[in-house]
């Protein structure tokens, strides 16, 4: 997950966790049976959990990676609940010293689950401490300084590390290789999100029609966290206006007032697309150039804004930079310039080149 960015605080469709999302805990599934979507990952986890319980051993370490808001933290909590063991949570940026990690690890009970969010932001020196802990359930610590320093090995209770990251490529290879169960979470389908929205409406205690749920799901960018946030905002509008049940037109009106369009894009997304279309003739343009022009951090563009735009074909990520896709031109209601319209073979060539745009 990218570092805190104040520009994201007012984005209703931001996939990063906001203060308002504290209410989402009440909407979270409590078991794998309740969990909607991520079918392959969910079914595999169920098998690994059952096998670990049958053997009476700690489950192998799990790496959950994918865009923010897809349920990594929720799945980690479900794993501990299904295993019937304790759950400890922390995050990469919080662990500043090897001693911090040692204190957490030595306090774990046998087979407990330790969840580390944003594990790609762990300092290299702390990663080194984690290697023997994951592989041999032992800690190697240096006690003292100078000539009096000595190495001490501490045995740990067997535990399961469940780690989450939005940037799996930033993990050091030795760390990544120590996860026996790597699972990639993908964007949710509209039908899966419709089920999530309908269930959320029941838990929040308001009447939402199937068409209303479908409208919210369609604009949720394939992300349950955004679906829950839009659901709560639609509920607010409906409550103040005294509308019940909430149908498609009510949901549409509320989302239009939030400036969330039919694809789930907000003003920030449209600024991004408009910048490429108008100022760069559809691209290619480097991400650093876009970040400077939009006054956003590069990480914010790559982790929060771009994944869904790429998924929907609105932009293309090539070795020379970002290009506006045909769907992007259509969504903006603009006609692509002749160079873009006639340059499709070149765009495909760019896409198949090795490497990615650094700028």
Curated annotation (Swiss-Prot):
Coiled coil feature spans: none
Residues that, per the record, bind ATP: 27-28, 69, 72-74, 135-137, 178, 188, 225
Gene3D superfamilies per record: 1.10.8.60, P-loop containing nucleotide triphosphate hydrolases (3.40.50.300), Winged helix-like DNA-binding domain superfamily/Winged helix DNA-binding domain (1.10.10.10)
Region ranges (Small ATPAse domain (RuvB-S)): 189-259
This enzyme's EC code(s): 3.6.4.-
Signal peptide location: none
Gene Ontology biological process: DNA recombination; DNA repair
Pfam families: AAA_lid_4, RuvB_C, RuvB_N
List of residues binding Mg(2+): 73
GO CC terms in record: cytoplasm; Holliday junction resolvase complex
Head domain (RuvB-H) as annotated region, ranges: 262-359
Reactions catalysed according to its record: ATP + H2O = ADP + phosphate + H(+)
Subcellular location: Cytoplasm
Keywords per UniProt: ATP-binding, Cytoplasm, DNA damage, DNA recombination, DNA repair, DNA-binding, Hydrolase, Nucleotide-binding
Annotated stretches, region: Large ATPase domain (RuvB-L): 4-188
GO molecular function annotations of the record: ATP binding; ATP hydrolysis activity; four-way junction DNA binding; four-way junction helicase activity
Family: Belongs to the RuvB family.
Protein purpose: The RuvA-RuvB-RuvC complex processes Holliday junction (HJ) DNA during genetic recombination and DNA repair, while the RuvA-RuvB complex plays an important role in the rescue of blocked DNA replication forks via replication fork reversal (RFR). RuvA specifically binds to HJ cruciform DNA, conferring on it an open structure. The RuvB hexamer acts as an ATP-dependent pump, pulling dsDNA into and through the RuvAB complex. RuvB forms 2 homohexamers on either side of HJ DNA bound by 1 or 2 RuvA tetramers; 4 subunits per hexamer contact DNA at a time.
Matches recorded under NCBIfam families: PRK00080.1, ruvB
Assembly notes: Homohexamer. Forms an RuvA(8)-RuvB(12)-Holliday junction (HJ) complex. HJ DNA is sandwiched between 2 RuvA tetramers; dsDNA enters through RuvA and exits via RuvB. An RuvB hexamer assembles on each DNA strand where it exits the tetramer. Each RuvB hexamer is contacted by two RuvA subunits (via domain III) on 2 adjacent RuvB subunits; this complex drives branch migration. In the full resolvosome a probable DNA-RuvA(4)-RuvB(12)-RuvC(2) complex forms which resolves the HJ.
The name this protein goes by in its record: Holliday junction branch migration complex subunit RuvB
Species this chain originates from: Granulibacter bethesdensis (strain ATCC BAA-1260 / CGDNIH1)
Taxonomy of the source species: Bacteria, Pseudomonadati, Pseudomonadota, Alphaproteobacteria, Acetobacterales
